[in-house]
From Swiss-Prot:
Belongs to the methyltransferase superfamily. LCMT family. Coiled coil: none annotated. It catalyses: 7-[(3S)-3-amino-3-carboxypropyl]wyosine(37) in tRNA(Phe) + S-adenosyl-L-methionine = 7-[(3S)-(3-amino-3-methoxycarbonyl)propyl]wyosine(37) in tRNA(Phe) + S-adenosyl-L-homocysteine; 7-[(3S)-(3-amino-3-methoxycarbonyl)propyl]wyosine(37) in tRNA(Phe) + S-adenosyl-L-methionine + CO2 = wybutosine(37) in tRNA(Phe) + S-adenosyl-L-homocysteine + 2 H(+). It comes from Aspergillus oryzae (strain ATCC 42149 / RIB 40) (Yellow koji mold). The gene is ppm2. This is tRNA wybutosine-synthesizing protein 4. InterPro entries: Cupin_8, JmjC_dom, Kelch-typ_b-propeller, Ppm1/Ppm2/Tcmp, SAM-dependent_MTases_sf.
């Protein structure tokens, strides 16, 4: 007889239980992130540690976002406790989860907490678990005077003098009200309610009932709620990404749709009986010195290098903190004013933004534009999907156009947040940038006469600086501000001379100007321009505005004349605060200075102000005539008269003036906190609405010519092969041997040999006969949702992402792929795709009995990591390697694979930290590319064949006829050394490699301060040592 089932909780059906579990699951993720913050940013004692079994260090963005959330809630409680009152005080945390805020405050501010009782309230199930954890933790129980742990079926789970824990569903307000009035609250008391991202998971009616009930619990009540909102509607890229995330978790946000704005949230509380309510975004609070003082903001950078400012601002702009009170209204809070547009400042009707957005095209952020011609530009370096890139993407205006000037060579280290400034004759200067925020670059590279070479380095590494061309006796590149590797915000001006090929310091007049990075620097003419925006040393966007003029003395030294026009522009322009920007791009056009994207202080850039125009002609007139008020200097272009594509996220982008009346925008996007990444894909062309030209700018598929280093170019003869021409066809391709494996010992010998073989004659089950299109559709289910790759060409590239991920039904996919569509399915976990590897038996149970590995491959079965199902149409998979060994079992159709031994990786254009090559091995004419110094091997798999692929063998695959169906089984062949943590796809590099890459960064950094040629000399010697060790 089996064990008796526990009775279900009274009044709670299984659906409600499941919903509650999903909501409680969001708390698990939240406290792991808060634990990460605690470990780094909080002094001991630590309290999250008792509720988080496996701590994880989150990214700097997640850490700072949760630091701000934690600070907001804690400061609100401290403010409440500091208020003078003759009543006992109670802090009621509604939906507290495992948050240990009471214990943290009792430990750090015991005197301040003397007259306050903390009451945690959440689901019964959660509070029982919390009680169990607290009971076992002396460090917490010692803080709780006269603590008593009550039975699980009691409403009050924990009772002590300073702290109580209550188990109650917030939808059961009758029970909660009874418990609080009978067992917790005296008749006269001051109450502060807390609700940190908890009520929004309730249906709106239930959440509003809590808000109304709370206003009547005490005549001296306050409410602090922290939740998400839509500062610019649900279609904003961050907002839409956030909403998809919570929906995918099964815990959608409800209140945000009913009360999307701050004004509506305030009115919600007033309608519920609260005398006054005031809401502010977290980004607004971050910028408030009274809430987070400047020294505290600056101190955070010393704990953890940070440069995710755009993403931090987007997060903070979508979360609000609202404070409401039932106390008599003393003075009405100032109403929120929005910067409106009038016919004089709204110029959106005069412009249009044309989008050309093929999915997966141009996914790159924080790069730089490489000038080429009026029909071609490059997008250099920056951050790709996986890592920083050293490559340059080519964009052209018409099909068949090729670049006319050289792009930066591949041996310039990958970087982001650098500048490239265009000079005459299509010369240009590349300056600085960074790897990590603690590892800036000071090297500089110049293209002159269509050749790239290094030039004098900066005095110190510099990134997030601003640069512009000026012309005096010759051309100069003027550089201002930025940050350096130790986190210092710079306030110096430098000028690089195209004649002398060196840097010189630029003196300035005595006017006070704050150091900054990410500022807007623009030209008005050859020697003068404007400076505004940027983030200062204390972590807020600056709101000043300067004009500058560069002078040259007779001795050749340079002098900068700065004039502060902040007050003048604030007085005469209603949109002045909309150009206080960080990370925007500025281009000189016939219309004036066009300011694109970035972030602004305290709020978000709304769609109607994404692109701004500063009329430099009007500005010059105003300066000359004493700033009359009838001039329109700043106007808004927004996103133009009509937007014919998805809304772009204009951060991390680049832009350039193609001609005096067209601006081309490329790249950009952001990591939307923990919700996912949004990419601004394709090309965007801003032009006058009267223009008749269309946006024909497009990304040319990746180059097939290997990047030659500068030294190779200097020593080799010019090649007749252009970058857009194919390789020669490989003449010698070794066939992979075919073998029969009859027992595990034979396969063990193959493993020890470490070379690929095709195993034939094995029994993999009835799948080879059964798995037709009709059978698979019926067995899997035609309505089942899957995610597939949809390719734009016959060759998929992981580097350029010339494909998109599409969610569709399995039946639709099978119809389309069998009709010849370029689609590819690599199955992922059906239950937890971001946490668990694919498992054919679990993900497709109806297929599990059809497929089996032969007994001779028992070592594979015993050490299996994952077993994805692969179904491919006429599309080629990119060249890549897997860290784990695997066997590829061909079930239906045929497939051709080309493999390269691990020693060939140095010739196959695999960027550092990546596992995929940039080369198309299968060329458009069907031949295999001949890559010098490599030894390609070929496998043609027929039905029932099993290809053993050893670890690190690079391989690419292409169907040779109809649809290919295969099962891929990855297995662990090492006892240790794999990457720590989660590895869903089995392709994370070994721990030793990742550690060594960090060591390389440290080695390179140790040469900071040396002349660049000396540093290069020694780094090349070290590289030779590494190569010698690798070849022993």
């Amino acid at each position: 007889m089996g064990p008796a089932k526990k009775p279900a909780m009274a009044g709670v059906n299984s659906k409600a239980e499941r919903e509650a579990d999903l909501v409680m699951g969001t708390n698990n993720s939240s406290i792991v992130s808060k634990r990460s913050v605690e470990m780094l940013y909080y002094s001991k004692p630590h309290f999250f540690r008792y509720f988080v079994k496996k701590p994880q260090r989150r990214s700097p963005l997640i850490n700072r976002g949760y630091w701000l959330r934690m600070h907001a809630m804690a400061e609100t409680v401290r403010k409440f406790m500091r208020e003078p009152s003759d009543k006992p005080k109670f802090v009621l945390n509604l939906g507290c989860g495992f948050d240990p805020l009471p214990y943290m405050l009792l430990s750090a501010d015991n005197d301040l907490c003397r007259d306050t009782t903390f009451v945690d309230i959440d689901y019964e199930k959660l509070m029982v678990n919390k009680k169990t954890a607290i009971r076992k933790t002396d460090e917490i129980t010692q803080l709780l005077e006269d603590v008593e742990f009550l039975p699980d079926d009691s409403a009050v789970q924990i009772r002590s003098k300073p702290y109580l824990a209550i188990g109650c569903d917030l939808k059961n307000l009758t029970k909660l009200d009874t418990v609080l009035r009978a067992e917790v609250l005296p008749s006269e008391c001051a109450v502060l309610f807390l609700a940190e991202v908890s009520l929004t998971y309730m249906d709106v009616k239930s959440a509003n009932a809590v808000v109304s009930w709370a206003s009547g619990l005490s005549n001296d009540a306050q409410f602090c709620i922290l939740e998400q909102f839509f500062p610019d509607g649900p279609d904003h890229p961050f907002a839409s990404t956030m909403m998809k995330h919570f929906k995918k978790l099964g815990a959608p946000l409800y209140s945000i749709h009913e009360y999307p704005s701050l004004n509506e949230q305030e009115q919600r509380f007033k309608d519920a009986g609260w005398n006054h309510a005031h809401a502010r975004s977290l980004w607004d609070l971050w910028s408030d010195d009274e809430f987070v003082d400047g020294s505290l903001r600056a101190s955070l950078d010393a704990i953890e290098p940070f440069d995710e400012w755009e993403e931090f601002a987007l997060f903070g702009s979508h979360y609000f903190l609202l404070h409401a009170s039932t106390r008599p209204r003393v003075s009405e809070t100032a109403t929120r004013t929005l910067t409106g547009l009038d016919p004089q400042t709204d110029k959106s009707g005069h412009f249009r933004l044309l989008a050309k957005c093929p999915p997966g095209s141009g996914q790159r952020r924080f790069g730089a534009v490489i000038p080429d011609s009026d029909k071609a530009v490059g997008h250099h370096s920056g951050l790709g999907r996986q890592t920083r890139l050293s490559s340059t993407e080519l964009y052209t205006k018409s099909e068949g156009t090729t670049k006319t000037h050289e792009f930066p060579p591949g041996d310039i280290p990958a970087r982001m947040c650098h500048t490239v400034t265009c000079l005459s004759n299509q010369d240009c200067l590349l300056v600085g940038g960074r790897a990590s925020p603690a590892s800036g670059f000071k090297d500089c590279w110049v293209r002159q006469g269509n050749q790239w070479r290094s030039t004098q380095s900066l005095p110190v590494p510099r990134f997030r600086h601003s640069a512009v061309k000026v012309t005096l006796d010759s051309e100069y590149v003027l550089v201002y501000g930025g940050k350096t590797s130790d986190g210092t915000t710079l306030n110096t001006w430098l000028a690089w001379s195209s004649k002398k090929q060196d840097w010189q310091q630029v003196e300035t007049n005595s006017i006070h100007i704050k150091a900054r990075f990410g500022a807007c620097l623009g030209s008005i003419n050859d020697t003068s321009g404007v400076l505004f925006g940027g983030i200062g040393a204390e972590g807020t966007i600056l709101g000043d505005f300067f004009t500058w003029k560069l002078h040259q003395r007779s001795d050749g030294s340079l002098f900068m004349e700065l004039t502060d026009h902040t007050d003048d522009l604030r007085r005469t322009s209603s949109l002045f605060n909309q150009i206080h920007r960080f990370g925007a791009t500025v281009n000189q056009t016939a219309w004036g200075l066009v300011i694109v994207g970035g972030i602004v202080p305290r709020g978000i850039i709304t769609h109607d102000k994404e692109i701004m125009l500063l009329d430099s002609t009007e500005l010059t007139k105003c300066i000359a005539s004493g700033w009359p008020s009838n001039h329109t200097i700043i106007s808004a272009l927004g996103l133009g008269n009509r937007l014919d594509g998805p809304r772009p996220l204009l951060v991390g982008h680049v832009s350039c003036a193609i001609d005096s009346k067209e601006i081309l925008i490329l790249g950009g996007g952001a990591v939307c906190f923990s919700f996912g990444t949004y990419w601004t894909e394709g090309t965007w062309l801003l032009q006058d609405v009267s223009s008749t030209t269309e946006n024909d700018w497009t990304l040319i598929p990746e180059s097939v010519e290997p990047n030659k280093s500068q030294s190779e170019k200097a020593t080799s003869k010019p090649s007749a092969q252009s970058q857009n021409e194919p390789y020669r066809a490989a003449e010698v391709i070794t066939p992979i041997p075919r073998v029969c494996v009859q027992n595990p010992a034979q396969f063990q010998d193959i493993l020890a040999e470490g070379r690929p073989v095709i195993i034939e004659g094995s029994d993999v089950g009835p799948c080879t006969e059964l798995w037709t299109k009709e059978y698979l559709t019926s067995a899997v289910g035609g309505d089942r949702k899957i995610v597939v790759h949809e390719a734009q060409s016959a060759h998929m590239s992981f580097q350029t992402k010339n494909f998109s991920y599409a969610t569709k039904t399995f039946g639709t996919f099978m119809d389309e792929v069998y009709a010849g569509d370029r689609q590819y399915l690599r199955s992922i976990s059906a239950e937890q795709p971001t946490k668990l590897p694919a498992n054919l038996a679990v993900d497709f149970p109806s297929l599990s009995h059809d497929f089996r590995l032969p007994e001779s491959l028992s070592i594979v079965t015993d050490n299996t990591h994952s077993s994805p199902l692969r179904i491919s149409g006429p599309v080629t998979l990119w060249l890549h390697y897997d860290v784990m060994a695997n066997v590829l079992c061909q079930i239906r159709g045929e497939k051709r694979l080309i493999l390269f031994p691990p020693s060939d990786v140095q010739y196959l254009q695999v960027p550092p930290g990546a596992s995929s090559s940039t080369i198309n091995i299968f060329q458009s004419n069907g031949s295999v590319a001949s890559i010098p110094h490599t030894s390609p091997q070929e496998a043609v798999l027929k039905r029932g064949d099993i290809l053993f692929i050893p670890p690190l063998w690079l391989h690419t695959a292409s169907p040779t006829g109809d649809v290919s169906v295969a099962v891929n089984v990855f297995f662990r062949n090492l006892s240790k050394g794999y990457a720590a943590g989660r590895d869903v796809y089995g392709n994370r590099d070994l721990q030793a490699y990742e550690k060594a890459r960090n060591d390389i960064q440290k080695m390179a950094k140790s040469f900071d301060g040396l002349p660049s040629e000396m540093a290069r000399f020694y780094l090349l010697r070290l590289a030779q040592e590494l190569k010698d060790k690798a070849e022993k």
